[in-house]
Amino acid sequence: MATKFPSFSQGLAQDPTTRRIWYGIATAHDFESHDGMTEEQLYQKLFSTHFGHLAIIGLWVAGNLFHIAWQGNFEQWVLDPLHTRPIAHAIWDPHFGQGLTDALTQAGATSPVNIAYSGLYHWWYTIGMRTNEQLFQGAIFINILVCWLLFAGWLHLQPKYRPSLAWFKNAESQLNHHLAVLFGFSSIAWTGHLIHVAIPESRGIHVGWENWLTVMPHPEGLTPFFSGNWGAYAQNPDSIDAVFGTSQGAGTAIFTFLGGLHPQSESLWLTDIAHHHLAIGVVFIIAGHMYRTNFGIGHSLKEIIEAHNTSHPKDPHRGYFGIKHNGLFETVNNSLHFQLGLALASLGVACSLVAQHMGALPSYAFIARDYTTQSALYTHHQYIAMFLMVGAFSHGAIFFVRDYDPELNKDNVLARILSTKEALISHLSWVTMLLGFHTLGIYVHNDVVVAFGTPEKQILIEPVFAQFAQAASGKMMYGFNALLANASSSASIAANSMPGNHYWMDMINRPDALTNFLPIGPADFLVHHAIALGLHTTALILIKGALDARGTKLIPDKKDLGFAFPCDGPGRGGTCDSSSWDATYLAMFWALNTIAWITFYWHWKHLAIWMGNTAQFNESGTYLMGWFRDYLWLNSSQLINGYNPFGVNALSPWAWMFLFGHLIWATGFMFLISWRGYWQELIETLVWAHQRTPIANLVGWRDKPVALSIVQARLVGLTHFTVGNFVTFGAFVIASTSGKFG
């Protein structure tokens, strides 16, 4: 007899309804809930999935390399990066008529192609790649790596090669390995690639497999390193007249501290980037030798954490603050959800920083002038950051439900956070209301006075504190005599005393979008507070969901109901919308709105600067109708014209995505508004009709069709809302930017 899906749960496998399928899919990756799962098996399975995950990433990277090498125009783009549109891949579609075929035959191609807005061309060019052959070689190498990773994943599931539970819980060895080997060595290795391959290529010197052992990165070789004369590596940097990819203006330095941008490529100096990776690598390798493992030297994490308490005889607070950190080492080390929450939060912050820095400190040659790519990458990384951050709180809540031990954490900082949750949640609630009422109040006031023809009556507040922070970093335009904006300050004197040329002040005072601190005014002040409202409300919902995960006054035994439950059951009034999963679900809507506001702001401000029309954002951004009319509507018009009575144009695929994204988004509401009763009745009506229709009733089914649970229907609704949201906005960003700048 064939085993029914899911094999990991006999209870579900015997369910006679379609619940078996949907619950099976929903819990396929919840290894903890599977039949017969031990803690050791759980760790081993997760460890093997890491190799599979890396293999999928590798296939994706190899696919990009292969398709661009095969169908792209990398070699043509390299010859003129500023005026050649990069091709992502060809499009073959039998439905295309001649009009669309002609419209999408672009960028010098002879058949329909997609334009690349990924920044991959800029990245590969910057790191020294110049030919399709090199891209093919990269794809082949990564595919070999993928095969090795898949084998490693399989191998570590075999009894002989499964790591033990003690190995997984050896925190010090794990830290040393991740810090020194994964982060440290990989940073040093990347430094090696930059100085051996990328920097020479940027100076017109080709380094390949045939000569990389004979072309020295620096004329003096390793002599300065071993003699301690490290400064030699910073002498003779590229001049400000340097032309990227040629010997014109090229120097010999490999590690510099120039600051600012290479004037011609308008990206960070490659020698600065190499210096950064070298320093990061050294720091991580030192950090990777800090923790006590084989030789009994170094720090014990448990000792460090437990020293963070107020039992020290010289501590003035001794005996007042409790035992603070006792029990935290075991709590974190024994909870995968706690560890995952920390990792997701860290990666979420890093990803949001990447979004900001790709615009403010562009590291790839000529990418700053590819406005559509810059817009797409900012949006892409902020959306990813949002998902990671929401996931961090979700797994924090699961930790409180599944892994938290009240006895182990008695009276420590974790227990105290739980015991003061009412104060934390109510203060966050107060902050969100203050932000919301004041920000919306000012926006609406401004809308009203503008509508009545008296724009001079708007409430316009200059962001003086932010302007002061910019001035302290060197921005002169505001007239603050602070730190780097004051030539006689100690900061300026120290900066000017550094030997050699430095270009930070040139960059921060540029008049265009390549200044790393854009000029800000009242429109920025308002949208900043609107975004702060969104962030605080998202945080409020998520923090409340996590801190209330174990129980509340309304449902004191909530931890026994699990992370995701629809209502608290009969006999108690059936309180709904109260599980930690519901908090995640509700927070996602706020998170999506907030990310939309963040990306709206970044995109509109940059569009205005790129088009030389900064007044549009500065004047229209102070009231809501300005945002709706001069950003959303004005930039949607090109999308809506992708198809028109005169035929189609190259924006038509984005126009189609824009419309279809709205449809997906709206479909979400069907699941969010209609609950189980409606769907169950609809299903039973369809079943009744099917069973009474000749020919159709020859086809039957084993599982009795039942409606999705409330939690599942919400997930389906949220998924449609989310996918529709970013399909719509992704198409909007790409089409509205590329429609203006190509």
From Swiss-Prot:
The enzyme's E.C. designation: 1.97.1.12
Q: Where in the cell is it found?
A: Cellular thylakoid membrane
Q: One GO biological process from the UniProt record?
A: photosynthesis
Q: Which SUPFAM superfamilies match?
A: Photosystem I subunits PsaA/PsaB
> Which Pfam families does the annotation name?
PsaA_PsaB
InterPro entries this protein is in?
A: PSI_PsaA/B, PSI_PsaA/B_CS, PSI_PsaA/B_sf, PSI_PsaB
Where along this sequence does the record place binding of divinyl chlorophyll a B3?
A: M670, Y678
Q: Which GO terms describe its cellular component?
A: photosystem I; plasma membrane-derived thylakoid membrane
A GO term, aspect molecular function = electron transfer activity
Q: Which residues bind divinyl chlorophyll a B1?
A: H662
Per the record, the major location class is membrane
Q: Which reaction does it catalyse?
A: reduced [plastocyanin] + hnu + oxidized [2Fe-2S]-[ferredoxin] = oxidized [plastocyanin] + reduced [2Fe-2S]-[ferredoxin]
Cofactor remark from the record: PSI electron transfer chain: 5 divinyl chlorophyll a, 1 divinyl chlorophyll a', 2 phylloquinones and 3 4Fe-4S clusters. PSI core antenna: 90 divinyl chlorophyll a, 22 carotenoids, 3 phospholipids and 1 galactolipid. P700 is a divinyl chlorophyll a/divinyl chlorophyll a' dimer, A0 is one or more divinyl chlorophyll a, A1 is one or both phylloquinones and FX is a shared 4Fe-4S iron-sulfur center.
| Residues at which [4Fe-4S] cluster binds | C567, C576
Transmembrane spans: 46-69, 135-158, 175-199, 273-291, 336-359, 375-401, 423-445, 525-543, 583-604, 651-673, 715-735
Q: Which UniProt keywords apply?
A: 4Fe-4S, Chlorophyll, Chromophore, Electron transport, Iron, Iron-sulfur, Magnesium, Membrane, Metal-binding, Oxidoreductase, Photosynthesis, Photosystem I, Thylakoid, Transmembrane, Transmembrane helix, Transport
PANTHER family tied to this protein:
OUTER MEMBRANE PROTEIN, OMPA-RELATED, PHOTOSYSTEM I P700 CHLOROPHYLL A APOPROTEIN A1-RELATED
Q: Which family does it belong to?
A: Belongs to the PsaA/PsaB family.
What function does the entry list?
PsaA and PsaB bind P700, the primary electron donor of photosystem I (PSI), as well as the electron acceptors A0, A1 and FX. PSI is a plastocyanin/cytochrome c6-ferredoxin oxidoreductase, converting photonic excitation into a charge separation, which transfers an electron from the donor P700 chlorophyll pair to the spectroscopically characterized acceptors A0, A1, FX, FA and FB in turn. Oxidized P700 is reduced on the lumenal side of the thylakoid membrane by plastocyanin or cytochrome c6.
The protein here is known as Photosystem I P700 chlorophyll a apoprotein A2
Q: Which organism is it from?
A: Prochlorococcus marinus (strain NATL2A)
Cite the source lineage.
Bacteria, Bacillati, Cyanobacteriota, Cyanophyceae, Synechococcales
User: Gene that codes for this?
Assistant: psaB
